[in-house]
Amino acid sequence: MSVDLATVKRVAKLARIAVSEDEANRMVGELNGILGFVEQLSEVNVDGVEAMTSVTPMAMKKRADEVTDGNKAADIVANAPVTDHNFFLVPKVVE
């Protein structure tokens, strides 16, 4: 897979990021380099290799899940300009 200039410009537009022509050209090379590295990783034979989350074995401390509302709704919306029944009200952005 490779990225072309049109793809970089399209992604920048979708992300609403201003990208100059020079930056877009530079990003094409950088993104293609990253994708090339990812393709190299996908070619590595990992048959028989056990999945791991860390280089060194670590045990995570666990706690029992408890469902609560946190009792902080009023604190959370206290600085919001407009709220209704502890919900944030925001302007409509999609027509």
From Swiss-Prot:
Protein name: Aspartyl/glutamyl-tRNA(Asn/Gln) amidotransferase subunit C
Gene3D superfamilies: Glu-tRNAGln amidotransferase C subunit, N-terminal domain
EC number(s) recorded for this UniProt protein: 6.3.5.-
Gene Ontology BP terms: glutaminyl-tRNAGln biosynthesis via transamidation; regulation of translational fidelity; translation
Keywords: ATP-binding, Ligase, Nucleotide-binding, Protein biosynthesis
SUPFAM superfamilies: Glu-tRNAGln amidotransferase C subunit
Role description: Allows the formation of correctly charged Asn-tRNA(Asn) or Gln-tRNA(Gln) through the transamidation of misacylated Asp-tRNA(Asn) or Glu-tRNA(Gln) in organisms which lack either or both of asparaginyl-tRNA or glutaminyl-tRNA synthetases. The reaction takes place in the presence of glutamine and ATP through an activated phospho-Asp-tRNA(Asn) or phospho-Glu-tRNA(Gln).
GO terms assigned for molecular function: asparaginyl-tRNA synthase (glutamine-hydrolyzing) activity; ATP binding; glutaminyl-tRNA synthase (glutamine-hydrolyzing) activity
Assembly and binders: Heterotrimer of A, B and C subunits.
Record Pfam families: GatC (PF02686)
Family indicated by similarity: Belongs to the GatC family.
Catalytic activity: L-glutamyl-tRNA(Gln) + L-glutamine + ATP + H2O = L-glutaminyl-tRNA(Gln) + L-glutamate + ADP + phosphate + H(+); L-aspartyl-tRNA(Asn) + L-glutamine + ATP + H2O = L-asparaginyl-tRNA(Asn) + L-glutamate + ADP + phosphate + 2 H(+)
Gene that this polypeptide is encoded by: gatC
Listed NCBIfam families: gatC
Species, as recorded: Rhizobium etli (strain ATCC 51251 / DSM 11541 / JCM 21823 / NBRC 15573 / CFN 42)
Taxonomic classification: Bacteria, Pseudomonadati, Pseudomonadota, Alphaproteobacteria, Hyphomicrobiales
